[in-house]
Curated annotation (Swiss-Prot):
Organism field: Methanospirillum hungatei JF-1 (strain ATCC 27890 / DSM 864 / NBRC 100397 / JF-1)
Protein name: Large ribosomal subunit protein eL30
Keywords of this entry: Ribonucleoprotein, Ribosomal protein
Cited InterPro entries: Ribosomal_eL30 (IPR000231), Ribosomal_eL30-like (IPR039109), Ribosomal_eL30-like_sf (IPR029064), Ribosomal_eL8/eL30/eS12/Gad45 (IPR004038)
Homology family: Belongs to the eukaryotic ribosomal protein eL30 family.
GO molecular function: RNA binding; structural constituent of ribosome
Pfam family, one: Ribosomal_L7Ae
Disulfide bonds: none
């Protein structure tokens, strides 16, 4: 399954948190199983992630606009956290 399909399935059947601040909260609570960041995610947030051991991350090849579209949202999404994957295989796709 490709990433966009896996992401959509996770959004529909699991628990996905959108936005940098909400993603940080999810990481701090220990709820984030996978963090996805857009290729153009701000360096400040990328630096924050690099200091978090044990957090699986996936860098989406597109921009925040494209990641938002992949989520089915009409707005920019520069970061998101997968807390529950639902029926998706997205947790196997980290890189």
């Amino acid at each position: 399954m490709d990433f966009n399909t896996s992401l959509r399935r996770a959004i529909k059947t699991g628990k996905v948190i959108l936005g940098q601040n909400e993603t940080k909260d999810s990481i701090e609570k220990g709820s984030a199983k996978l963090v996805v960041v857009a290729a153009n995610c701000p360096a400040e947030f990328s630096g924050y992630l690099s200091g978090k051991d044990g957090v699986k991350t996936y860098t989406y090849e597109g921009s925040g606009v494209q990641l938002g579209r992949a989520c089915g949202k009409p707005f920019i999404v520069s970061a998101l956290a997968i807390e529950e994957s639902g029926d998706s295989d997205i947790l196997t796709l980290s890189r």
